Amino acid sequence: MNNSLKKEERVEEDNGKSDGNRGKPSTEVVRTVTEEEVDEFFKILRRVHVATRTVAKVNGGVAEGELPSKKRKRSQNLGLRNSLDCNGVRDGEFDEINRVGLQGLGLDLNCKPEPDSVSLSL
């Protein structure tokens, strides 16, 4: 019972902390945030939201506030494309050029380009 009284006294001396600074006042530094920092944070947050919405629209044409579903991402990774080409133009509809050779292939920036694999017919 005498041990429990010592523990209670020790907790009161440490102010609830047992970090080895018994009986010493705590030296916590409390940093206040300025209005400018708060404004800057929210500006950055808005930019991230705008960028996310823009990427979501470009990648799948989804409604605002929704990101592409896992199923859509999976189908895009497998090469199952929708009717829109990467640049938003339907395949050969507006520019009247039939593209042969690159449809269904992913773009790999690490490989060297092969100019013979692309053929345009007018």
Curated annotation (Swiss-Prot):
Biased segments, Basic and acidic residues type: 1-22
Stretches the record annotates as Disordered: 1-28
Residue window of motif Nuclear localization signal: 70-74
Ranges for region Involved in NPR1/NIM1 interaction: 39-45
Cell location: Nucleus
Disulfide bonds: none
GO cellular component assignments: nucleus
Keyword set, alphabetical order: Nucleus
Taxonomic superkingdom: Eukaryota
Induction (record text): By salicylic acid (SA) and BTH.
GO BP: regulation of systemic acquired resistance
Subunit: Interacts with NPR1 N-terminal region.
Annotated protein name in UniProt: Protein NIM1-INTERACTING 2
